[in-house]
Amino acid sequence: MPLNRLLTLGVGVCTAVALSVPVGAVPASASHHRTGGSLVLVGGAHADDNREIYEDIVRLAGGPGRARIGIVTAAAPVPAEDPDAGTPDCNNSVCNGDYYAGLFRSYGAADAQWIPIDLDHPGAADDPAVVRQIESLTGFFFGGGDQYRYVTTMTRGKAQRDSAALAAVRRKLRGGAVVAGTSAGAQIMAGRDMITGGSTEPGLRDGAKPGYFDDPAVLGYLPRGGFGFFTAGLVDTHFSRRGREARSIRLASDTRHARVFGLDENTALEVTGVGGRRTSLRVLGQRGVSVLDLRRARVTGHGGVWGVEGVRWSRLTAGDAYLAPRWTVVPAAGKSRVRPAAGPCTATPSEDVFYDYAMVGLVEEGLAARTGCVAVGGTSYEKDPQWAARLTRGAGFAAYRGATATTFTGVVIGIRAA
């Protein structure tokens, strides 16, 4: 898969736009509440050879030879915006739709087809033929790009109500279908205060602002959220690869959310029983899904600069489950407990702590590795101002070794101006 198809695309507008997007859900019938549908939320950079995740989506859509999957790529640029249109390096709504359709067929789907909604054809989201197409399918996959494009193409009017197509997808989800997405396609599943963009260091300094912004540094959010399919907490993608732990903490603090789910690249959070009586969450894929718990967090202000203490951090890896009502991590069977070895701390403080799995590395190489690592941390690369992160073992700290990544729970995060 071309690298540029894995990257998030920003779309410029002239001014910040304050928006509100209702989830517009219709109460499900009693029969729907008994089971519900499924979500598969991928943190971006979804490798085309990640058999575990693709086959899971096909399974949830009815299984090999039965699954019929609709591909939605409205977050991508349209062909006229793509300088590589018509080449193997294309990255646009049409070629991405064809690409994913072929990929899902290669993983056993009986059929996979593009749903023709994009910025060139927003009216298609109210076309009865498109609604009939959606009603014939058993699963859906939303591609990456800019999640705000999903808002502009699939919601309607000043009140941002569901288009006919989105309402049909919502009904299918309640009725048992799977809805999956990667990067922006996962982000759009979120409920209120969905993030629209923003860099970590400016976001920490200036705080979160409602709306969609041309400046990619502004930490923006939509107060009424995305499609509202996933409401157990805020969602962020490309999480530890892009060091988004801190920006998510600031957004959650400013919008008074107690929990954030951070999805790493090439990794998925599977949610089954959506809208049903029992909802289950588990992790699949290469890296991890972070859960940030702000229930006991407190905002500080050193020298008038925002800071926070007491954020609890857990990270689940492949096979782990999460009990959302209990805020509890359940490590997968067979994972061995990691016991810190006796001795002084050898973990090196990070000089770029909000980037490229730096904070995960501090836990794995510090808190989980040596008893002498009472606290680990580092500073931000940016220096206007420079930020410091401090990680300590909280009550109930534990780490477990997985095949490709380490599960941990009970890490406490503090962030302040350096």
For the regions a protein language model found, what residue spans apply to each?
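Secretory targeting and sorting signals
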Residues: M1-A30
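C-terminal and late-domain segments of enzyme folds
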Residues: S31-G65, I71-V94, I195, T200-A418
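Divalent cation-coordinating acidic motifs and surrounding scaffolds
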Residues: I71, E81-P83, Y100, D111-P116, ...
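Functional beta-strand-loop-alpha-helix junction segments that form "active/interaction loops"
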Residues: D89-N91, S106-V130
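A short, aliphatic-rich alpha-helical micro-motif
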Residues: I134-E135, L173
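Catalytic nucleophile loop
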Residues: F141-G144, A168-V169, L173-D193
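Glycine/threonine-rich flexible loop motifs
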Residues: Q147-D162
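Cysteine protease catalytic core and zymogen-processing segment of caspase-like enzymes
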Residues: K158-R171, G207-P210
